[in-house]
Amino acid sequence: MQRKVALIFGGRSLEKEISIITAMQVLKNIDKSKFKVEPVYVDDGNFYVGDVDDIKQFTPFNPSLHEKAYLINGEFFKFKRGKLVKVFKPDVAFLCCHGGEGENGTLQGIMEFNGIAYTSCGVLASACCMDKVFSKSVFSSLLLNVLPYETVMKADFEKDRQGAVEWLKAVLDYPIIVKP
């Protein structure tokens, strides 16, 4: 029996187009004899289900061309002729979203709340890793090797960009890696 996989991609991040490529790669390489894949596109906090044979239909995304789906108690539904109809119940969600809610624990939390197993770190690990300053602090406290780092908050950078750059040049050696 094939396991049902919700292939979740899209999102609010600037990287949502990359997630479509990720989803297409998963679809190309997944063992279709073992897994039945159902694409689920995320846009502006909403789910949309579509045809697995045409994932490219989601780029550029036009919500008026797709039916909104609702995740209720671990099952995806959509409205048909005014009635809520079950689309599918995934056994697992393959998370392909990049950045933002796809990596910061939000989507992972939605899956956990709905009792759906998923590919990814858990909620806490995802949230911690998304915050680079927090991650470095935790890793340092565990005596793990961490490159020297400094933090410039966005508000401070916007107030005095040149001053922030000069300060970083003075306290760090090149090459410098910048993580927003």
Feature-to-residue mapping (PLM):
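ATP-grasp fold ATP-binding core
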Residues: 139-140, 168-180
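Glycine-rich phosphate-binding loop of ATP-grasp-fold ATP-dependent ligases
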Residues: 19, 146-151, 175-180
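Short, well-ordered coil/turn elements that cap or connect secondary structure elements
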Residues: 32-34, 113, 141-144, 171-172
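ATP-binding N-terminal substructure of ATP-dependent carboxylate-amine bond-forming enzymes
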Residues: 1-119, 123-124, 128-130, 134, ...
